[in-house]
Amino acid sequence: MAVAFYIPDQATLLREAEQKEQQILRLRESQWRFLATVVLETLRQYTSCHPKTGRKSGKYRKPSQ
């Protein structure tokens, strides 16, 4: 009994490898874009909700002796 195996040529293998690589790169880019969006939105909310902390103005401080 004869068994035939399909052996793809090099061009087909390269094309499939490039397609898989592009798919992985698109997925990676979308994940980084999502992470950057989450970080930026968190920072934006944090800066808009919390007033700046620092020294109070001079008129509320006791004068130095």
UniProtKB/Swiss-Prot annotation:
Protein name: Cell death protein rpr
Superkingdom in the source lineage: Eukaryota
Organism the protein comes from: Drosophila melanogaster (Fruit fly)
Disulfide bonds, paired cysteine numbers: none
Function: Activator of apoptosis, as well as grim and hid, that acts on the effector Dredd.
Keyword flag Ribonucleoprotein: no
GO CC terms of this entry: mitochondrial outer membrane; mitochondrion
Keyword terms of this UniProt record: Apoptosis
GO molecular function: phospholipid binding; protein homodimerization activity; ubiquitin conjugating enzyme binding; ubiquitin ligase inhibitor activity; ubiquitin protein ligase binding
Gene: rpr
Entry's Gene Ontology BP terms: apoptotic process; apoptotic signaling pathway; autophagic cell death; cellular response to gamma radiation; cellular response to ionizing radiation; imaginal disc-derived male genitalia morphogenesis; intrinsic apoptotic signaling pathway in response to DNA damage; larval central nervous system remodeling
Source taxonomy: Eukaryota, Metazoa, Ecdysozoa, Arthropoda, Hexapoda
Additional information: Ectopic expression in the developing eye results in a small eye owing to excess cell death.
Subunit (UniProt): Interacts with Diap2 (via BIR2 domain).
